[in-house]
From Swiss-Prot:
HAMAP family: MoaC_B. This is Cyclic pyranopterin monophosphate synthase. It catalyses: (8S)-3',8-cyclo-7,8-dihydroguanosine 5'-triphosphate = cyclic pyranopterin phosphate + diphosphate. GO terms for biological process: Mo-molybdopterin cofactor biosynthetic process. Belongs to the MoaC family. GO terms for molecular function: cyclic pyranopterin monophosphate synthase activity. Substrate binds at residues 73-75, 110-111. Pathway: Cofactor biosynthesis; molybdopterin biosynthesis. InterPro entries: MoaC (IPR023045), MoaC_bact/euk (IPR047594), MoaC_sf (IPR036522), MoCo_biosynth_MoaA/MoaC (IPR050105), Mopterin_CF_biosynth-C_dom (IPR002820). Keywords: Lyase, Molybdenum cofactor biosynthesis. Catalyzes the conversion of (8S)-3',8-cyclo-7,8-dihydroguanosine 5'-triphosphate to cyclic pyranopterin monophosphate (cPMP). The active site is at 125. Gene3D superfamilies: Molybdopterin cofactor biosynthesis C (MoaC) domain.
Length: 156
């Protein structure tokens, strides 16, 4: 059953008024594949626009806080923690892992996915002058804890 549709198939925001406040956490990831020399420039701190990882981390955190402004039926949430980790993966990729937490009545999956996605978009934006062929891929939910649907963890 799609919870964002009413009995007549119209979009609506889910009413969470009666839901219990519980601890909730979600972790999402994204990857940005790029030329090896682009990744090396980022890792060596030689990008002319500055620290790519630092800017992408801040962008991801900001995006998590703005998710309800971007995704029409998401509730505005009082996130208690947003962490965005970026790391070089192999010779040609950046892996982004975003983790969001709160004590609330609805989950934080969309906030984690938005944080990872916007961090990836920020890397693309900062590096597009030197590598227009970058690919953002593998945006996905890794784990979700709390709430009625319980624990979800992607299979390795």
């Amino acid at each position: 059953m799609l919870t964002h549709l009413d009995s007549q198939g119209r979009a609506n925001m889910v009413d969470v008024t009666e839901k219990a406040v519980t601890e909730r956490e979600a972790t999402a990831e994204a990857r940005v594949r790029m030329l090896p020399q682009t990744l090396q420039m980022i890792v060596d701190g030689e990008h002319p626009k500055g620290d790519v990882f630092a800017v992408a981390r801040i962008a991801g955190i900001q995006a998590a806080k703005k998710t309800s402004d971007l995704i029409p039926l998401c509730h505005p949430l009082m996130l208690t923690s947003v962490k965005v980790e970026l790391s070089a993966e192999g010779q040609d990729a950046v892996r982004i892992v975003a983790r969001c937490k709160l004590a609330g009545q609805t989950g934080v999956e969309m906030e984690a996915l938005t944080a990872a996605s916007v961090a990836a978009l920020t890397i693309y934006d900062m590096c597009k002058a030197v590598d227009k062929g970058m690919v953002i891929e593998q945006v996905r939910l890794l784990e979700k804890l709390g709430g009625k649907s319980g624990h979800y963890k992607v299979e390795a």
